[in-house]
Structures are given as C-alpha cells and as structure tokens.
Amino acid sequence: MGTKIIGTGVYLPKNVLTNFDLEKIVDTSDEWITTRTGIKERRIAKEETITYMATQAAKEALREANLSPEELDLIILATLTPQKRFPSTACLVQAQLKAKGVYAFDISAACSGFIYALDIADSFIKSGKAKNVLVIGAEKLSEAVDWEDRSTCVLFGDGAGAVVVTRSEDKSDILATRMYAEGSLEELLHADNCGYIRMKGRELFKVAVRSMEEVCREVLEKAGVKPEEVSLVIPHQANVRIINALAEKLNIPKEKVFVNIQKYGNTSAASIPIALHEAIKEGKVKRGDLILMTAMGGGLTWGAVLLRY
C-alpha cells in the first residue's frame, strides 16, 4: 500500500509587489535584493484571507483529484499565520468546502510545515486510518513582517498550495521521510513579541545548508536511491543562495532543482506545494519520477520527503 498524490492546486494573490516597489518603502534596491536572494517580486494578499487562499487551492486540488470534499477523511493545514487563534484555519477551510464532519487540524512548523504535514498524512494512510487526505500549506506573511526592516520585508510573500493524497496500490508512493526539530536554535528564526519575523541570516544559512544536505542524504539512503537517480529536487524557496549551495553539496545539477522564488519570494509552508504544482504543470514532473522535497524553518524545524510521483 502506497501514498499517491492525485491532485494539486494553488492560489496566488493578484497583487504583485516588485523590488522596485520596495525601493519606495525601505532603503533597498532591486540589485541588492536580487543578488542576495534571487527574488524579483512577491504576491501580497489585500482582501484575501488565509482561509480564502487555502480554500481556493484546496478546491483546485480536489477538482484535479476528481474527489468531492465529503470523500475526504482528513484535512491538515500547515501555517504560521493562522486566521484566528482558534478555531484552526483547517476547520475554517473545512466549513468553506462543506466537508461536513471531516477531521481537520493545523500544524505549526514554519517553512517545514508542508513536509511535516505530508509526513503525517502518509502515516494516516499507511496505518489504515485514512484513505483520502487534503494537505495544505498557506501563509499570509505580509501580516507577519516589519515593513521597516529591510532585512526581512523583502523576503516574504503570500499564497497557498494544496495536494490530495490517497491510498494507492501502484508504484506511486512516499518512499521515505525524516523530520527534525531543534528548539535550542529558535533565536535564529522566530517571531518577536509584536509577531514580526526576526532572523539571523548568516548563521541560518550555514545551518540550513548543512541540515538539509544531511536529511536529504538520510532519506535517499533509507530508500536505496542515489542522488543522481532523483528526477527533480523541490526545495523550500527561501533564498536562491541556499538552494544553489544545497544542490552543490548533493552534487545534483541545477537543471534538476526547481526554482520559482524569483516570482513569489519565501511563502513559508506554501512554497513547496506551489512549486510542486508549477513543476507538474510545466511538464517537469511526470508519473514515475523520483521527487525529493526538503525544507528548513523556524523552530528550528527541518526535514525531507522522497516520493515516486
């Protein structure tokens, strides 16, 4: 019995904030942002709530999966920007989908949230407790940044991505997962008392590259897969320098690493499902391909998922 992705969906706010727009807000420049992060623009939700964005992404994923909301057994939503303290955003999405009675909860693992949630979904399916699971990563980070702090406000964007996974008897499967957390390093990336994102970029860069390389090698070894056998790496879209350094450490050519950070910035838990959806639609992922996903986020949290699409 395997866990198969049968539908993906995204929602990206229509409002685009470019680096040139940011030049008018803080002391920065397009050149400074691009050379250090790879980001050219990001989406900013104005009227859209996180519940709305997550629901739209979920509806697209369900349509592609040819499932009705009532056929779901579980909804897991990863976010660090929930709409309310409670109830969970997953419950709000459940109501919008009219998925009456479907088990729903949020998880908080920052930028690692989506792969944490996918790991949980895989466990539910393989234990026999669920057949169809909706996994969502959604963020409204524009409400969590200090727009006077040029070191962070240039990095983040809003959006949502969703996947539907189901029990499968074919070759498609989540082959290996590994998740980690290290709370003693929380000061490297955290929210301050005002709820604004604060980070120590240089220290975080080193930890991120090393930790993601190690966990990627761990899941590859667990599955008996060599790095050169991977069809596509879909990393969390945090910083193009981190992505490039990770690819170099794993000795994986850049053409086998998916990057869309230039369009959306860092969307935290939403970044990997958005990237997966785009990679599929662009023909860069096909059935039978080996896909390696990895992320690091506040916590610190990090992990990797190896799947056969």
UniProtKB/Swiss-Prot annotation:
Gene Ontology BP, a term: fatty acid biosynthetic process
Localization annotation: Cytoplasm
Reaction(s) the record says it catalyses: malonyl-[ACP] + acetyl-CoA + H(+) = 3-oxobutanoyl-[ACP] + CO2 + CoA
Cellular component GO terms, alphabetical: cytoplasm
GO MF terms held by the record: 3-oxoacyl-[acyl-carrier-protein] synthase activity; beta-ketoacyl-acyl-carrier-protein synthase III activity
Disulfide cysteine pairs (residue numbers): none
Enzyme active site: 111, 236, 266
Lineage of origin: Bacteria, Pseudomonadati, Aquificota, Aquificia, Aquificales
Gene assigned in the entry: fabH
Family: Belongs to the thiolase-like superfamily. FabH family.
Keywords assigned by UniProt, alphabetized: Acyltransferase, Cytoplasm, Fatty acid biosynthesis, Fatty acid metabolism, Lipid biosynthesis, Lipid metabolism, Multifunctional enzyme, Transferase
Region (ACP-binding): 237-241
Location, primary (coarse class): cytoplasm
Protein name: Beta-ketoacyl-[acyl-carrier-protein] synthase III
CDD domains: KAS_III
Function: Catalyzes the condensation reaction of fatty acid synthesis by the addition to an acyl acceptor of two carbons from malonyl-ACP. Catalyzes the first condensation reaction which initiates fatty acid synthesis and may therefore play a role in governing the total rate of fatty acid production. Possesses both acetoacetyl-ACP synthase and acetyl transacylase activities. Its substrate specificity determines the biosynthesis of branched-chain and/or straight-chain of fatty acids.
UniProt cross-references to HAMAP family, sorted A to Z: FabH
Pathway annotation: Lipid metabolism; fatty acid biosynthesis
